[in-house]
């Protein structure tokens, strides 16, 4: 504890490194290469979904007085499905509060999860994140970034016109509404794995909106 303020705190250094990826004030992901273009067509579709679902748009429980990072319903939907985000999901080197003493710790280990938008090469992104965290470390600290569980999100290719027309016809006939792309699950790698294995196949994933989606 006597060296506090002279010796760098490993937790402070970890915070500095995370700030290379995320704006700690807003939660916005900083590197441009972690973003992908949200096209006007995507925005229009998302806007239609938000208008259709209204109050049923997915919400999350919050303690009284706590505000979301994003408030506008359209921004919420786009952020959840088409934008990157960072979460700290685990930590080592930090003792439990009941056993913590007033001494500097030798290391802080964090496990982070970075959600990448559909359409990005996750392996390439992982190497860039590793370089971003390890290069020019603050105070000359020894920093190691190990990448695990790297997988692509799924950017659904355009359906053939006959399939799209049949889907539209069926939706109007049975539900009285036009068919829509929801983009939900686009950041989940399962469909990208299937598309990579069956490159000539087209997929229509339904039901993601929940039992009341229709």
Language model feature labels by segment:
Residues 1-7, 98-101:
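A short glycine-threonine-serine/GTX helix/turn-capping micro-motif
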Residues 3-30, 111, 123-131, 207-214:
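His/Asp/Glu-rich mid-to-C-terminal helical/loop segments that flank catalytic regions of hydrolases
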Residues 29-107, 115-128, 136, 140-214:
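An extended, acidic, His-containing surface patch that forms the Zn2+-binding/catalytic region
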């Amino acid at each position: 504890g006597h060296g506090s303020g002279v010796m760098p705190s490993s937790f402070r250094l970890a915070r500095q490194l995370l700030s290379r990826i995320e704006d700690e004030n807003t939660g916005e992901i900083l590197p441009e290469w972690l973003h992908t273009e949200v096209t006007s067509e995507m925005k229009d579709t998302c806007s239609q979904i938000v208008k259709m679902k209204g109050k049923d748009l997915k919400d999350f429980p919050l303690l009284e007085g706590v505000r979301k990072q994003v408030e506008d319903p359209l921004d919420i939907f786009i952020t959840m499905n088409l934008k990157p985000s960072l979460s700290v999901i685990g930590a080592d080197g930090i003792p439990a509060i009941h056993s913590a003493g007033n001494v500097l710790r030798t290391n802080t280990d964090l496990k982070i999860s970075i959600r990448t938008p559909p359409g990005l090469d996750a392996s390439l992104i992982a190497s860039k994140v590793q370089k971003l965290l390890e290069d020019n470390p603050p105070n000359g600290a020894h920093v190691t970034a190990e990448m695990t569980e790297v997988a692509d999100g799924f950017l659904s290719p355009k359906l053939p016109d006959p399939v799209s027309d049949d889907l539209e016809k069926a939706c109007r006939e049975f539900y009285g509404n036009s068919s829509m792309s929801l983009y939900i699950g686009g950041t989940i790698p399962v469909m990208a794995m299937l598309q990579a294995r069956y490159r000539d196949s087209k997929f229509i994933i339904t039901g993601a909106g929940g039992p009341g989606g229709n």
